Amino acid sequence: MDLHSRRIISHKVGKFMDIKLVMDTLKMVIYKREDTTNLIIHTDRGSQYMSKEYRKFCAEKGISISYSRKGNPYDNACIESFHATLKKEYVHNEKFENLESLRTGMYEYMEIWYNNSRIHSKIGFLSPNEYEESHKERKQKNCLKIV
């Protein structure tokens, strides 16, 4: 989740929450965002995020790592809140036949509905994509003023 816009940048669904799943998700973030300048990834202290492979990859890409304090989920309140919303609005209301139907459902919820339609008070009652678009427009106008 981009904390500025509340946009879900990348997500993966797998049978196991292992280093491969984490690395695949992180690589997709880099692919979608392209520029990792000033990128900070904040996570809990799960073994996947504490691994040498993860830390080395982030260092090579110039990504700063931030960890929640041990036993303190409030340090990552935005994503904890998102997970609660995801469960309440979607997961608990659906029946998934298999892993593929779960993947499809998660894609539809996050990419099609959440990023495009779910409004947030913290970003002016806009959806994450609307907020990012308006931010880009303001940035472009500011650049034009400078030139």
Protein language model annotation of sequence segments:
Residues 35-50, 69, 126-129:
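Acidic/histidine-rich, metal-coordinating catalytic segments
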Residues 2-12:
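Electropositive, glycine- and tryptophan-enriched low-complexity nucleic-acid-binding patches
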Residues 59-63, 85-147:
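C-terminal domain-tail junction helix/linker
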Residues 14, 18, 22, 50, ...:
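Hydrophobic (often cysteine-bearing) scaffold residues that line and stabilize catalytic clefts
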Residues 41-45, 60-78, 94-97:
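RNase H-like polynucleotidyl transferase catalytic core
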Residues 12-34:
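Active-site beta-loop-alpha junctions of metal-dependent nucleic acid enzymes
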